[in-house]
A protein has these predicted regions:
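Active-site-adjacent structural elements that line small-molecule/cofactor binding pockets in enzymes
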Residues: 1-317
């Protein structure tokens, strides 16, 4: 799908010392003005002091933040951002489904989408941290089936005037969940790369929201996702293929251990081209920064040097 229009989003400053009201608002305004199409927030409700679960996105398996770090709740944060933006879509990367009752989550998301006039994208996942899920009352070992049901429930709440559902984990009869989203739906991008996650994308997702996956691994995942789509008679081309990836600039080329989109401008352009050939249509960029000024400077440089090289002009809606 290399001829499709590329879109680029930015991760908001939602964790660590830069996670302040002023920084979130200033960053959101600036990124929309630069032409970025979407703004994103991650999800952790609590950070236990002892985490035995393996973090899946770095070689050490250690979660990179201490339990004393601020971590803004994503839907609350996006509601704030909705009030100071007009065009940018607002997304979760990802909302951990077992953290919230699905009817409550449906209500919160519908309210956000109502106030944002239809700009919400729901990135979802089942979560990796057993400790956090169990603290919040979830069953870690059943979280996959539970999350599948949660997705179905949210769609029922968003589309039916008298919502009703009967399943293994939840059952309710004729409830009103108003307001509903302006589109009677919110796009759901399913995260994960395990066989079950890719099956969930094919069965229940509007898109796949991959994270930090190098191109060679990504190519294999795409092949497996195509196979899952065939099993359920789903058109692969109907899925949005999206990727969350780190971003940093270097003055000299990195070596063999260089991570994608972390290198010289020429390397970053080449990385984007390779992902684009594999079908990625939307990138969520997460800057590797020292402070907020550094974070903003990275995104300014990307808009100035990289974007013109990979797409004719920022797409504004």
């Amino acid at each position: 799908m290399p001829d499709a229009v590329l879109t680029f989003g930015c991760h908001l400053p939602t964790f660590g010392p830069i996670a302040t009201r002023g920084n979130v608002l200033a960053f959101a305004r600036k990124m929309e003005a630069l032409g970025y199409e979407s703004l994103w927030a991650s999800d952790h409700v609590v950070l236990p002091y002892t985490i035995k679960s393996k973090y899946p996105y770095n070689p050490t398996g250690q979660f990179p933040l201490p339990p004393t770090a601020a971590f803004l709740e994503p839907l609350t944060t996006l509601a704030l951002v909705a009030g100071v933006t007009e065009r940018a879509q607002l997304g979760t990367t990802i909302l951990v489904l077992p953290h919230r009752h699905p009817v409550l989550a449906a209500k919160m998301l519908a309210t956000l989408d109502h106030l944002a006039e239809g700009r919400v994208i729901l990135g979802v996942g089942v979560g990796w941290m057993r400790e956090e899920i169990e603290i919040l009352g979830g069953n870690y070992d059943r979280r996959g089936a539970w999350s599948d049901e949660a997705i179905r429930i949210m769609r029922v709440c968003w589309s039916q005037e008298r919502a009703r559902y009967g399943g293994e984990f939840f059952s309710f009869d004729e409830i009103g969940v108003v307001p509903q989203p302006p589109r009677k739906a919110i796009p759901i991008w399913v995260g994960g790369h395990t066989p079950r996650a890719l099956r969930r994308v094919a069965e229940l997702g509007d898109g796949w929201h991959a994270a930090f996956t190098p191109p060679d691994v990504f190519a294999g995942d795409i092949a497996r996702l195509r196979a899952e789509c065939e099993k359920v008679n789903r058109r692969f081309d109907d899925l949005a293929i999206t990727l969350r990836v780190g971003l940093s600039f270097r003055d000299t080329p990195g070596g063999a251990d260089r991570k994608p989109l972390q290198g010289t401008p020429e390397q970053i352009v080449a990385d984007i081209g390779r992902y684009r050939e594999l079908g990625v249509g939307s990138f969520l960029l997460e800057a590797r920064y020292r402070d907020l000024d550094d974070m903003v400077a990275i995104f300014e440089r990307f808009a100035r040097e990289i974007r013109p090289a990979v797409t004719p002009s920022p797409r504004r809606t």
